[in-house]
């Protein structure tokens, strides 16, 4: 970003559908830059940069990625259930009410959010808000997810549970999940 530092040399990542892949690095190591390239928000400056999907080259940003940023972008005045309903209307356009309801219930249950359905976002802990942010993006039909520091605000047990849940969701829903983190614990 704005300088001539080479962040990566011969970066080669292979990811299968239903898999969770971690990108681990210290602050300033290029994790955000790589994320912006994958999302198509930044053009790579290297001579050769390719993303292959099913063995065929695709343009960065041309695929449908869901992205959960590190910062909380939730509407604090809404209840958890209202938040999921709001995003389901966007992510699940064309789906019937029953389909939306079942999808929301399944994700909320998987992420341990069912008991907080009637609480306002402003009443949740940081870790609970994080799970809501992840859950609403999991509503998306996108096969690709980037989660930026998903364990931010979570205690060690919640972090392990979240990663286990992400692995299960990746397999059961055929999602490819990229976890961006500096956390070497998990």
Task: State each model region's role.
Residues 99-116:
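Conserved ABC ATPase "signature" region
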Residues 137-138:
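ABC ATPase C-loop
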Residues 4-19, 47-49:
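Conserved beta-strand
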Residues 145-149:
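Catalytic Walker B motif of ABC-type/P-loop ATPase nucleotide-binding domains
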Residues 71, 76-93, 103:
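Q-loop/switch helix immediately C-terminal to the Walker
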Residues 120-124:
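Conserved ABC ATPase signature
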Residues 24-26:
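The feature captures the beta-strand-to-loop junction immediately N-terminal to the Walker
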Residues 39:
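Helix-to-loop junction immediately C-terminal to a conserved catalytic motif
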């Amino acid at each position: 970003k704005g300088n001539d530092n080479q962040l990566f040399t011969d970066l080669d990542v292979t990811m299968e559908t239903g898999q969770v892949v971690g990108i681990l690095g210290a602050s300033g190591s290029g994790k955000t830059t790589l994320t912006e390239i994958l999302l198509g928000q930044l053009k790579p400056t290297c001579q050769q940069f390719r993303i292959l999907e099913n063995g065929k080259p695709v343009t960065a940003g041309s695929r449908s990625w869901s992205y959960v940023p590190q910062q909380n972008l939730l509407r604090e005045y809404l209840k958890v259930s209202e938040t999921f309903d709001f995003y389901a209307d966007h992510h699940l356009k064309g789906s019937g009410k029953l389909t939306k309801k079942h999808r929301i219930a399944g994700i909320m249950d998987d992420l341990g959010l069912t008991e907080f359905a009637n609480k306002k976002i402003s009443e949740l802990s940081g870790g609970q808000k994080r799970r809501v942010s992840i859950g609403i993006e999991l509503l998306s039909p996108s096969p690709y997810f980037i989660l930026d520091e998903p364990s931010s605000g979570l205690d060690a047990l919640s972090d392990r549970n979240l990663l286990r849940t992400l692995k299960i969701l990746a397999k059961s829903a055929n999602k490819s999940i990229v976890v961006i983190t500096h956390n070497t614990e998990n």
